[in-house]
Amino acid sequence: VLSPIPSSRRTQRGRQTYSRYQTLELEKEFLFNPYLTRKRRIEVSHALGLTERQVKIWFQNRRMKWKKENNKDKFPSSKCEQEELEKEKLER
């Protein structure tokens, strides 16, 4: 993979772990609104002691998780599930 930044300058970031309190507050905020304005993102990041970037990425990841969970019913995740759905349709 080619990168515009030389490998000697790239830094590998570790995985961010959030405290229970931070996760709870982020989840509450997400339930209220899955999309944050920049102003609200700044407020949340200051209140939780996180960077704006961390909050932004947490929300992006959470929206993808929500999307996957809600599409589970609509799209079978395996061939076996697909066959079961087709079988049910034929029985109707």
From Swiss-Prot:
UniProt name for this protein: Homeobox protein Hox-B8
Alphabetical list of SMART domains matching this protein: HOX
Alphabetized Pfam families for the sequence: Homeodomain (PF00046)
GO cellular component: nucleus
SUPFAM superfamilies, alphabetized: Homeodomain-like (SSF46689)
Compartments, record wording: Nucleus
Portion annotated as DNA-binding: 11-70
Major location category of this protein: nucleus
Family: Belongs to the Antp homeobox family.
UniProt keyword annotations, A-Z: Developmental protein, DNA-binding, Homeobox, Nucleus, Transcription, Transcription regulation
Region (Disordered): 68-92
Expression sites by tissue: Predominantly spinal cord and kidney.
